[in-house]
Amino acid sequence: MESERIRTELLLEKAIKITSFLILEYANIDNSQWSMGGGTILMLNYHHRLSKDVDIFVSNTQYFNGLSPKLNDVAEDADFYQEGERFISLSYPEGKIDFVKAFQVSDYLPTLKHVFNQNIFVDDDIEIVTKKVFFRGASLHPRDLYDLATVYLGPRRSELVNALINIPEQLQEFHDALQRVGPGFSFSEDYGLDLVLDIPLGLKGREVDICIDLCNEVRKSLV
């Protein structure tokens, strides 16, 4: 598992250098107008699972199309890519880089940090998991549930609850989806090697129940 973590961090270092070069040199998007978030940042902060993908959230979308392999000489080296209205996804043997048109969904702003030998803006943990509920909570991605449960059981529980209070419609969709699978359900078999098993939280197999508890706590605050 340790060798897997080292390999992951090395490929992510390569990936962030690629994305930085793409953004700064080709798309002309200033580094103050994009941030790194998603499971990779949570992995670095909580060490709760492995994450091999890089998520770059672009707030200034004026030059977003410049990240496309159709227009970007560096991006065209990707083995495979997908484009949608709000995203450009580049796949490499080492992992995937997702560029996403996104806006801030909480009051927790990105901060400048030294990550993978780069000074970049990094999304706050609360913003990361709130985005997961806002943009795709109803889809019940197993990794999202595990991330949410991890943050909820951590020291920033009240901050997460307060952030979700401000997105009641998306929270309701998330809650309804959880109710459809029901208490006691687990996605644990879907994780494979994505989990780091030596953490003391003991949440593997309980992630759905923990997220239901989270929703119930937020809903009580809305009454």
Language-model features and meaning:
Residues 1-223:
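Compositionally biased terminal segments of proteins
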